[in-house]
From Swiss-Prot:
Lineage: Eukaryota, Metazoa, Chordata, Craniata, Vertebrata
Tissues in which the protein is found: Abundant expression in the brain.
A GO cellular component entry from the record: cilium
UniProt keyword annotation of Plastid present: no
Residues on Cytoplasmic side: 91-102, 162-182, 243-277, 326-415
Entry protein name: Probable G-protein coupled receptor 19
Keywords from the named record: Cell membrane, Disulfide bond, G-protein coupled receptor, Glycoprotein, Membrane, Receptor, Transducer, Transmembrane, Transmembrane helix
InterPro entries: GPCR_Rhodpsn, GPCR_Rhodpsn_7TM, GPR19_7tmA
Native source species: Homo sapiens
């Protein structure tokens, strides 16, 4: 190695190390003619850099943008309107206020959260082909995308535990409203802390990109595996085991262990219908969020930005369909929910039976707790004597109303 000296009048000598060159190439580097191979290498590097930049800024066709916007828009409207309606009906209707419905409201709030804080931004990134909202927004969007499914799966596990003890061991353990609130709060607090590392793994390294998947480093891989086990596999296995025991108990209720027909079952049919509804709900949820967890385990390299964007958008649409399908499932399997909607929007012929049917007395309060209804009795079906109480007080006996108790034990389930 030799050293070349550069003289300057205003500065001290600067010693620059240079490599030995062959004797036939002793000319100055500024005047030396580069080889053709060097030009080819520089051109290839420039081409690869430009191709990477074009992958990061793709342009979708108008048809692709319209299709994605329509599908996401329909699901978004169903999710916002349906889950808001679930919260409103359970809040206003007395017939739907129960312990199980606390869990239902918690899931509806989680669906509203992902509908507002995550899904619109994913659609915006897909349609524009870049991320323009900064690194902090990228972290928050991905955080809520991990938070909501974890909260919901643990709330579904809480519902499963509630159904198990209500049907199999009704006298040994009961999930009261206070216990339900504590279980819901524990689900939110635990998962909020569990998905905190997402804030460190995600972020916008440059202004126009927000990573879709966790990094392929050993830290990212380790967290992905732990999140898949704790946030999906273990709760799913527990849910399956609990519902398996519940189904066995429903079909095998004899003291001697013999199998009986469902018509001889001591379990009320309303609770059997509730189990069916929650089984379908759990199945839809697990199938909807399974592709999301599998894609995170796969750790695809985001070299082709358009391809990874298409994959992630499809996965987001599948998982988001679970949020939009829950209110539809409630309205199909839940007669009380349908009646609650009628009471909420005053669509019933008996507009607000609780406010117009009774005076404020002790007996009226007891009647409200026992779900008293009102029936119209036609005048042709009654025989009233001349000296009856109606004639004494000059009351017309054309349309008199009779109150009767519908159910002495109001249901404590969602159905």
């Amino acid at each position: 190695m030799v050293f070349a000296h550069r003289m300057d009048n205003s500065k001290p000598h600067l010693i620059i190390p240079t490599l030995l060159v062959p004797l036939q190439n002793r000319s100055c580097t500024e005047t030396a003619t580069p080889l053709p191979s060097q030009y080819l290498m520089e051109l290839s590097e420039e081409h690869s850099w430009m191709s990477n930049q074009t992958d990061l800024h793709y342009v979708l066709k108008p048809g692709e943008v319209a299709t994605a916007s329509i599908f996401f828009g329909i699901l978004w409207l169903f999710s916002i309107f349906g889950n808001s309606l679930v919260c409103l009906v359970i809040h206003r209707s007395r017939r739907t206020q129960s312990t199980t419905n606390y869990f239902v409201v918690s899931m509806a709030c989680a669906d509203l959260l992902i509908s507002v804080a995550s899904t619109p931004f994913v659609l915006l990134q897909f349609t524009t082909g870049r991320w323009t909202l900064g690194s902090a927004t990228c972290k928050v969007v991905r955080y809520f995308q991990y938070l909501t499914p974890g909260v919901q799966i643990y709330v579904l596990l809480s519902i499963c535990i509630d159904r198990f003890y209500t049907i199999v061991y009704p006298l040994s353990f009961k999930v009261s409203r206070e216990k339900a609130k504590k279980m819901i709060a524990a689900s939110w607090v635990f998962d909020a802390g569990f998905v905190t590392p997402v804030l460190f793994f995600y972020g916008s390294n440059w202004d126009s990109h927000c990573n879709y998947f966790l990094p392929s480093s050993w830290e990212g891989t380790a967290y992905t595996v732990i999140h898949f086990l704790v946030g999906f596999v273990i709760p799913s296995v527990l849910i399956i085991l609990f519902y398996q025991k519940v189904i066995k108990y429903i079909w095998r209720i004899g003291t001697d262990g013999r199998t009986v027909r469902r018509t001889m079952n001591i379990v009320p049919r309303t609770k059997v219908k509730t189990i069916k509804m929650f089984l379908i709900l759990n199945l839809l949820f697990l199938l909807s969020w399974l592709p999301f967890h599998v894609a995170q385990l796969w750790h695809p390299h985001e070299q082709d930005y358009k391809k990874s964007s298409l994959v992630f958008t499809a996965i987001t649409w599948i998982s988001f369909s679970s949020s939009a399908s829950k209110p539809t499932l409630y309205s199909i399997y839940n007669a009380n929910f349908r009646r609650g909607m009628k009471e909420t929007f005053c669509m019933s012929s008996m507009k607000c039976y609780r406010s117009n049917a009774y005076t404020i007395t002790t007996s009226s309060r007891m009647a409200k707790k026992n779900y008293v209804g009102i029936s119209e009795i036609p005048s042709m079906a009654k025989t009233i004597t001349k000296d009856s109480i109606y004639d004494s007080f000059d009351r017309e006996a054309k349309e008199k109303k009779l109150a009767w108790p519908i159910n002495s034990n109001p249901p404590n389930t969602f159905v």
